[in-house]
Amino acid sequence: MKKLFIGIVAVLILFSCGQSYEESKRLSKALRIKLAKEDSAALKIAVMPTLDCLPFYLAEDHNLFDTAVDIRLKHFTAQMDVDTAMMNRRVELAVTDLVRAERMIKQDSSIGYLTATNAYWQLITNRIARMTQLKHLEDKMLAMTRYSVTDMLGDLAVDSVKLKPEFVFRIQINDVNIRLKMLENNEMDALLLTEPQAAQARLLKHKVLLDTRSLDMKMGAVVMRNKEMTEKNRKRQLDVMIKGYNDACDSINKNGVAAYSDLVMKYCKVKKNTVESLKDIKFEKISVPRQHDIECARKWLSKK
């Protein structure tokens, strides 16, 4: 009798545990569906650990986006992953460069420009390699991302000193943090970086051989899905996002980048002295890219 009682109790316990597990599974599935619906309805922006994304970081962290509207930042460390998210409709907006933007637009005509950004790129050489001129890139490794502004600038650097392209070894390193780390560890001869990674490299006494600012090239951009932005809810989200972005630009221009060093350190993974070295950087409010910059990207892509 005692054994029978113990057996019944054991069965009841197992049955109870089974119910709890099934109930838990059901609730977890329901929660996942709920969260997926909320994420789908939100305005999602793909961002990178780069300084051109600072207005988005500031607007989110300092509640400059109207809280009545759901705006979410999606974080990536490689531009290719940003573009994949955009092409697969996992985000509605993406911070990118004009070369990658034009490549996306060619594949999907529903993608268009929201704004240019203040991003600029520098070709930086490892101080140990002792390269003082672009012609010294011969037989050296250059880190970049294919079909991006860094790829285009690599061509520009090589062509400007009439080097044979096959004598400069292009190494595709998509993650900007890994690219910088390879320079710091002396695993790369040269690379193309934007801020704040470029500033950290400069503080380590690595040499700048090319700067898009001196070439009058403004290649940073934010793209969006044009058709979706005409829908009532999306348009409202976009209007709120634009206001928050512009307000963030005003704040940065008034207070300076260093005033938001905590945000740059948090999202870009650089040191405080790196942020403090970034002086006189201004952020423009929403304005479309210049046509001749777009044409520059198109012309380069047409040869690929």
What spans do the regions from the language model cover?
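Sec-dependent signal peptide recognition
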Residues: 2-8
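C-terminal motif of bacterial Sec signal peptides marking the signal peptidase cleavage site
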Residues: 15-16
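Ligand-binding clefts/hinges and TM-proximal coupling segments of bilobed small-molecule sensing domains
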Residues: 19-26, 147-169, 240-279
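An extracytoplasmic/periplasmic, membrane-proximal ligand-sensing/linker region
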Residues: 21-30, 35-41, 51, 190, ...
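Short, glycine-/small- and polar/acidic-enriched structural segments
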Residues: 21-164, 170-171, 182, 189-195, ...
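Second-shell loop/turn segments in exported
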Residues: 43-44, 139-144, 227-234, 246-253, ...
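Proline/Glycine/Serine-rich low-complexity intrinsically disordered segments
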Residues: 84, 128-135, 158-160, 166-168, ...
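Pocket-lining segment of extracytoplasmic ligand-binding domains
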Residues: 98-100, 167-264
